[in-house]
Amino acid sequence: MTDSAKPEVSGLSFEKAVAELESIVARLERGDVALDESIEIYERGEALKKHCETLLSAAENRIEKIRLDRAGKPRGVEPLDGA
């Protein structure tokens, strides 16, 4: 896939972003990429990493735990971290 054909990082799902990031890491670890291309894919990797962190943070904020009343019955939900 050429650089112009790659989708915008912000439009990728978490799973697709991680898969592309893993591919970039593998290419860089092999060491068979020209310096200019290495810099370009490293920069895309940084953007993918940031995007994944943003998506994970958003997912963590959505996770809730169930509150129980004294009888042990579900009473509602609250943020997982208690905030």
Swiss-Prot record:
EC annotation from Swiss-Prot or TrEMBL: 3.1.11.6
BP terms from Gene Ontology: DNA catabolic process
Entry GO MF terms: exodeoxyribonuclease VII activity
SUPFAM superfamilies with a match to the protein in the record: XseB-like
Keyword NADP attached: no
Keywords: Cytoplasm, Exonuclease, Hydrolase, Nuclease
The protein's assembly and partners: Heterooligomer composed of large and small subunits.
Protein name: Exodeoxyribonuclease 7 small subunit
Organism name: Rhizobium etli (strain ATCC 51251 / DSM 11541 / JCM 21823 / NBRC 15573 / CFN 42)
